[in-house]
């Protein structure tokens, strides 16, 4: 492949998983122009349906879309993300109801992880103290690092930060599936096929993702 283009999308919390593959792909195929966007899950699905993207990396849609195909990559449990010095950091597991007395910083409504939480645990979410809502996952993790707020995020999004801890939830139905989505029946460009293969290989070599896939 000497020339061509590739249009990739990812939700904010998973875009970092594309970095290594983007570097390797661009070095190997310098003539391929890559456009990458980080958006909310809802916006990515809209862009796929409008043929504005070749594929998108995101967690499962709370609402099934019969117009999209998916390639499953891995499952990740929703976890409570806290600073290592937070009282909750010493726990192995915790229930959502136990978080009522704590100040939470969460992705804003309309972002994929928040939609999943609201859809699966509507009654509990209404009673939690959500003090901050953000549309930037990087800032969200910076705020957790202050040890003032806690958050609920998929474990796979936890940054490589020795100051943060992920505490598993007691509730069932906490796993979320990360997948590549494309339009049903769409033709994969050669560039897209190669990138997807490289991404799958990169994720298979990612130690944290390996542990999630094998539930170790």
How should each PLM-predicted stretch be described?
Residues 1-6, 97-101:
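Immediate post-signal peptide segment of exported/extracytoplasmic ligand-binding proteins
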Residues 3-29, 33-35, 42-45, 109, ...:
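N-terminal winged-helix
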Residues 65-71, 75-76, 91, 98, ...:
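Beta-alpha-beta core module
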Residues 28-29, 141, 155-163, 172-216:
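C-terminal effector-binding regulatory domain of bacterial HTH transcription factors
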Residues 20-24, 42-78, 82, 145-146, ...:
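Short beta-strand-centered segments that line the small-molecule binding cleft or hinge
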Residues 4-9, 56, 81, 105, ...:
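Short, well-ordered beta-strand segments
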Residues 40, 44-52, 59, 112-167:
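Hydrophobic hinge/microswitch elements
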Residues 17-18, 89, 102-124, 188-192, ...:
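Secondary-structure junction motif
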């Amino acid at each position: 492949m000497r020339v061509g283009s590739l249009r990739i999308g990812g939700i904010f919390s998973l875009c970092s998983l594309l970095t290594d593959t983007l570097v390797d792909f661009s070095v190997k195929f310098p003539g391929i122009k890559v456009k990458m966007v980080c958006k909310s899950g809802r916006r990515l699905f809209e862009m796929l349906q409008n043929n504005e993207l070749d594929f998108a990396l995101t967690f499962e849609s709370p609402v099934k879309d019969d117009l999209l195909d998916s390639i499953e990559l891995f499952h990740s449990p929703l976890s409570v993300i806290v600073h290592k010095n937070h009282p909750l950091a010493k726990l192995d597991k915790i229930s959502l109801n136990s978080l009522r007395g704590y100040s939470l910083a969460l992705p804003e409504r309309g972002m994929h992880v928040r939609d999943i939480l609201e859809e699966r645990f509507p009654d509990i979410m209404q009673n939690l103290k959500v003090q901050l809502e953000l549309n930037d996952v990087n800032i969200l993790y910076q705020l957790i690092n202050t040890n003032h707020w806690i958050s609920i995020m998929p474990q796979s999004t936890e940054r490589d930060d020795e100051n943060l801890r992920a505490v598993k939830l007691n509730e069932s139905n906490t796993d979320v599936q990360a997948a590549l989505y494309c339009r049903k029946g769409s033709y994969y460009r050669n560039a897209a096929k190669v990138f997807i293969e490289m991404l799958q290989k990169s994720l298979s070599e990612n130690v944290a993702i390996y542990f999630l896939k094998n539930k170790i």
